[in-house]
């Protein structure tokens, strides 16, 4: 049986932390930033933990 392939789109979007948590970037920080408040762009900085309802599905896509 060949190896399972991980979903390449999901592998670019999600990272697994050292403790096994799934991390993702926040949306709305790619473009059209000049009309968004600085407070909002700072708040959207950094990573966020994937919601508990989505963890099972994302792990399946990543082959974990």
UniProtKB/Swiss-Prot annotation:
Residues 1-41 are annotated as: Disordered. One of its GO terms (molecular function) is structural constituent of ribosome. Keywords: Ribonucleoprotein, Ribosomal protein. GO terms for cellular component: cytosolic large ribosomal subunit. Gene3D superfamilies: 4.10.410.60. Coiled coil: none annotated. Pfam families: Ribosomal_L35p. InterPro entries: Ribosomal_bL35 (IPR001706), Ribosomal_bL35-like (IPR021137), Ribosomal_bL35_CS (IPR018265), Ribosomal_bL35_sf (IPR037229). GO terms for biological process: translation. PROSITE patterns: RIBOSOMAL_L35. Belongs to the bacterial ribosomal protein bL35 family. This is Large ribosomal subunit protein bL35. It comes from Nocardia farcinica (strain IFM 10152).
């Amino acid at each position: 049986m060949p190896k399972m392939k991980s979903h390449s789109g999901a592998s670019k979007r999600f990272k697994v932390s050292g403790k096994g948590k799934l991390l993702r970037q926040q949306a709305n920080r790619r473009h059209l930033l000049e009309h968004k408040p600085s407070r909002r762009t700072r708040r959207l900085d950094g990573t966020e933990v994937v919601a508990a309802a989505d963890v099972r599905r994302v792990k399946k896509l990543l082959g974990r």
